[in-house]
């Protein structure tokens, strides 16, 4: 009993130490640390320990005893940033190779040197704020880091009734499937905005794309994600490109016509720089295509 309790307390202590280092790397260098794909950012002690236990389904025996030294060595590496680092995979590789852990980690992340200053941000506008829009908002906000990468700057909706802003904020806070929002949300009625985890998200009320000048809100070179499904062809979605401040458009539904339907991990390399409008395909397509690709590649 004493042995098991002592082991548990030791792992709790290591997880507590990890929280500080994880936060430091995330805030100062925009590094998202994970364990076999599961992010450790903003996680509790128990959640960190559980993330390690879940590796058993991949026949990997891993604990914070193995990953904490990797994280500690990672924190010592200078001039890196804007990346996801899988502590679990590095820990397994280190167990096989051995040697000086600081040298091993420094060599493993060598390709990330200089990243801290090279990743520019991209303004994002959600055109529509239904279920898909709100889930997208959660994902973008959770990865907003220090303002590099995707920055959710605005949502465009039709004004429904009095108290519209508070209602939309409430729907973002709570989801019947995905649970409560991870963080804090407040409403700025005067400036018609939602503040989520420190991100100022302007709520623009408009009935059509033609009504919006995004540059008036400090939004430039933006990616508009149309999640309304109202327009599904290139001609209809091209309305967004005519708005000042918009550079590209993504549709969150299967497209019509010749527009590319893209599933990341399957055909994302088909996207060309001249493609200003693409479709992210349907939820069914995204769910089944990666599995079909694996089967097709294998058999």
Kindly give the residue locations of the regions a language model identified.
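N-terminal Rossmann-like NAD(P) cofactor-binding subdomain of oxidoreductases
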Residues: 1-299
């Amino acid at each position: 009993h004493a042995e098991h309790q002592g082991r548990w307390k030791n792992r709790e202590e290591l997880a507590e130490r990890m929280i500080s280092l994880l936060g430091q790397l995330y805030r100062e260098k925009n590094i998202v640390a994970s364990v076999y794909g599961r992010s450790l950012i903003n996680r509790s002690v128990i959640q960190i320990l559980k993330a390690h236990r879940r590796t058993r389904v991949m026949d990997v025996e891993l604990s914070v005893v193995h990953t904490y030294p990797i994280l500690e060595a990672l924190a010592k590496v200078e001039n890196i940033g804007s990346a996801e680092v899988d502590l679990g995979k590095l820990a397994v590789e280190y167990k096989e190779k051995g040697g000086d852990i600081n040298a091993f980690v420094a060599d493993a992340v060598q390709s990330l040197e200089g990243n801290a200053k090279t990743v520019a941000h991209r303004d994002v506008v959600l055109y529509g704020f239904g279920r898909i829009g709100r889930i997208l908002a959660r994902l973008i906000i959770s990865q907003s880091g220090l303002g590099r990468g995707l920055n959710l700057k605005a949502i465009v909706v039709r004004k429904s009734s009095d108290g519209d802003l508070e209602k939309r904020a409430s729907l973002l806070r709570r989801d019947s499937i995905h649970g409560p929002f991870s963080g804090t949300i407040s409403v700025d009625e005067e400036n018609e905005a939602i503040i989520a985890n420190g991100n100022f998200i302007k709520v623009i009320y408009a009935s059509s794309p033609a009504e919006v000048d995004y540059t008036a809100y400090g939004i430039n070179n933006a990616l508009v994600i149309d999640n309304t499904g109202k327009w599904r062809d290139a001609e209809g979605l091209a309305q967004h490109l005519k708005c000042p401040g918009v550079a590209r458009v993504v549709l969150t539904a299967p497209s019509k016509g010749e527009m590319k339907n893209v599933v990341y991990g399957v055909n994302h390399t088909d996207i060309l720089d001249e493609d200003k409008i693409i479709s992210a395909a349907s939820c069914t397509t995204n769910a089944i295509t990666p599995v079909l690709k694996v089967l097709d590649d294998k058999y």
